[in-house]
Amino acid sequence: MASELDGLPVIATRREEAEGFLQGLVSKSLGWARKYSLFTYPFVTACCGMEYMTMASARYDSDRFGAAMPRFSPRQADLLMVVGTVNCKQAPILQRVYEQMADPKWVMAFGVCASSGGFYDNYATVQGIDRVIPVDVYVPGCPPRPEQVLDGIMLLQKKIQNQSHKLIDRKPLPVISGGAGR
């Protein structure tokens, strides 16, 4: 015997399914919001810094992609842009900067030197920052053109939007009842 509801889509039948559906919607909303609000922290060490300044200028307008003005503290940033060569003495500093960033955090290797050590193949140069910290996007070039950097930002935005964004489970605070006759 067919009922009137046959053929209609059912969103959720149990409470757990409804919570999963709601968390999925919230996760997609957070992904959309986070992809357009990247707070960058530039770790500039070499000549690619000139191209970074060009990319951040009004001509290329990185603000329209959500990567606005750079932050002056890694604690305020969620995108670490490693610009240029990193030597072995700077590697612990870079790792400390990465650890100071709050989650979620992403890393962009800006240029060939940050990606693979560039033409500095010697004992003092880190042959790619992925040996020190995890990297999300590699931007090639020596130095990379601003268009390539903006393309890397758009690739990172796609990655951010497709990630699952978990909500923080906050337990309720305990209720402290005070007696009236203390």
UniProtKB/Swiss-Prot annotation:
CC per GO annotation: plasma membrane; respiratory chain complex I
A Pfam family that the UniProt record links to this protein: Oxidored_q6
Chain's role: NDH-1 shuttles electrons from NADH, via FMN and iron-sulfur (Fe-S) centers, to quinones in the respiratory chain. The immediate electron acceptor for the enzyme in this species is believed to be ubiquinone. Couples the redox reaction to proton translocation (for every two electrons transferred, four hydrogen ions are translocated across the cytoplasmic membrane), and thus conserves the redox energy in a proton gradient.
Residues at which [4Fe-4S] cluster binds: C47, C48, C113, C142
Cofactor note (record): Binds 1 [4Fe-4S] cluster.
Family: Belongs to the complex I 20 kDa subunit family.
Disulfide bridge positions per record: none
Keyword terms, alphabetized: 4Fe-4S, Cell inner membrane, Cell membrane, Iron, Iron-sulfur, Membrane, Metal-binding, NAD, Quinone, Translocase, Transport, Ubiquinone
Location(s) in or outside the cell: Cell inner membrane
EC number, as in UniProt: 7.1.1.-
UniProt catalytic activity: a quinone + NADH + 5 H(+)(in) = a quinol + NAD(+) + 4 H(+)(out)
Complex and partners: NDH-1 is composed of 14 different subunits. Subunits NuoB, C, D, E, F, and G constitute the peripheral sector of the complex.
Annotated membrane topology: Peripheral membrane protein
InterPro entries hit by this protein: NADH_UbQ_OxRdtase-like_20kDa, NADH_UQ_OxRdtase_20Kd_su
GO BP annotations, alphabetical order: aerobic respiration; electron transport coupled proton transport
MF GO annotations: 4 iron, 4 sulfur cluster binding; iron ion binding; NADH dehydrogenase (ubiquinone) activity; NADH:ubiquinone reductase (non-electrogenic) activity; quinone binding
Species of provenance: Anaeromyxobacter sp. (strain K)
Name assigned to this protein: NADH-quinone oxidoreductase subunit B 2
HAMAP family, A to Z: NDH1_NuoB
Co-factor requirement: [4Fe-4S] cluster
